[in-house]
Amino acid sequence: MADGLDIRVRLDGFDRLVRSLDSVDVGQRTRLFLDGVGHLIVSEARLRAPVNVGLLRSSIFHEVDQQEPPRYVDVGSRVRYAPYMEYGTGTTHDHPSWPKVRHIPFVNRDEDGRPVAALFWYAKRKGLGFGGGYAIARAIAKRGGLMPRRFLRGSIEDLRGRIGERWVEVRDGISRHIAGGGQA
């Protein structure tokens, strides 16, 4: 993905399970399971996502693998700044491959070409006045960067148990079907 953030949830042991099955529609059951997992993670991530105007929160999506049977679900956001909200920036980030360099918010230019702090419009919406954007930028620079918000990774970590339980239910239902227990 060129812009945005994408985290993949992969099913361990899935290939072994598929090889042992011929009589069951594993693809359909797995697709329903992964779609449900995607919805679950998206719902939790939207609750955790930082909100300014709601663009990041509303952009969180999930997409199930298109191959048959599906093996993963992607959950992410195509908003350009999503990775920086997830991992943080500067010296405070927790991304495994980004350099630890102090983050100093850049300067944008307004319609007339005058320099305006990148956070000026945010500060104005929050009622902090003209100097508010500069004060926020200064605080970010002093701290070294934005702190990680972990809205996606935190959701996956907290839901790991529920996802595992659901996968066991799907797996056991398939096993019962194969053993002659009928539809599960």
Q: What does each of the following model-derived ranges do?
A:
Residues M1-A184:
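Short, Lys/Arg-rich flexible segments
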